[in-house]
């Protein structure tokens, strides 16, 4: 939807701002979960903390939150005119278009290189999201409240990073923003694998958050700039698919390495490998000339 909603010269900024808004929503949701369920679930809502009812209730809270704040988008965001083509025909035509694009892989080789790179480094980001809390609990003995507070801090720095780097995306290009962000992720992840003091875990962890937003926002912007106008829907479909297709590989690798070496630290090094591999693949992606603008 992004290329249809904003001018090309503002695509990077709006992508960054929207990610920042998402992180702001995450902060509010985490605060709600912390104070309503984790800290006061038993006293206020009668939840049994012995059976972890207060923890499980946060999943319901998150689902309701997601539903409620999706409604404005469905009601207010402009959409393309309605097409009366039967659903079955739409699916058939879409699959045929995808088949044709795969046959023309050489023509879209640059886009596929980007999708491959993004697939790899996005797996690393998914691992950080999924196992960061487990690592914090297992290695630094952080409890549920501390992990949620840490998550709030990560969302704050991620929102600031998404806003701060959004101008760089438009002025210097999405590829440079992605590469800088990946390097900005590699350095803190490396440090976190070696620090022993929880204070330094917090410092490096919050620094890690600064680059979460930019790498994701700039990836979306670059896809919007690389995709031909008549293939945007298809290419963004592949973009979404590339973010999910191999999402199971990272956790599997992390689990195997952790068990093999009996160490969470060594297991989390999988994140570093994926980030570095994604960085190297991104070097081969060619970006269209950046949009010239004076705003």
Predicted features along the sequence, with ranges:
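Juxtamembrane intracellular "pre-TM" segments in multi-pass secondary transporters
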Residues: 78-116
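Short amphipathic helix-loop junctions that connect adjacent transmembrane helices
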Residues: 130-147
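Structural signature of the two symmetry-related core transmembrane helices
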Residues: 176-191
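Helix-loop junctions at membrane interfaces in 12-TM secondary transporters
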Residues: 193-205
């Amino acid at each position: 939807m992004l290329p249809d909603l904003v001018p090309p010269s503002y695509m990077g900024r709006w992508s960054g701002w929207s990610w920042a808004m998402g992180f702001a929503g995450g902060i509010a949701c985490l605060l709600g979960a912390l104070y309503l369920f984790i800290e006061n679930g038993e006293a206020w809502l009668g939840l049994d903390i012995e059976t972890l009812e207060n923890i499980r209730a946060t999943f319901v809270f998150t689902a309701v939150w997601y539903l409620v704040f999706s409604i404005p988008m469905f009601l207010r965001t402009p959409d393309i005119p309605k097409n009366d083509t039967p659903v079955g025909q739409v699916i058939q035509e879409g699959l045929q278009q995808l088949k044709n694009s795969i046959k023309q892989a050489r023509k879209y080789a640059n886009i596929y290189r980007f999708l491959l790179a993004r697939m790899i480094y996005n797996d690393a980001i998914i691992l950080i999201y999924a196992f960061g809390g487990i690592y914090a609990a297992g290695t630094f003995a952080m409890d549920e409240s501390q992990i949620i507070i840490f998550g709030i801090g990560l969302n704050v720095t991620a929102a600031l990073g998404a806003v701060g780097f959004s101008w760089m995306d438009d002025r210097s290009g999405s590829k440079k923003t992605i590469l800088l962000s990946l390097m900005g992720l590699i350095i803190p992840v490396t440090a976190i694998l070696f620090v022993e003091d929880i204070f330094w875990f917090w410092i490096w962890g919050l620094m890690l958050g600064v680059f979460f937003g930019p790498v994701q926002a700039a990836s979306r912007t670059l896809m919007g700039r690389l995709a031909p106008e008549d293939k945007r829907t298809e290419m963004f479909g592949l973009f979404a698919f590339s973010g999910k297709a191999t999402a199971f590989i990272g956790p599997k690798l992390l689990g195997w390495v952790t068990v093999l070496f009996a160490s969470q630290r060594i297991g989390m090094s999988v994140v570093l490998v994926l980030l570095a591999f994604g960085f190297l693949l991104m070097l081969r992606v060619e970006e269209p000339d950046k949009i010239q603008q004076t705003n």
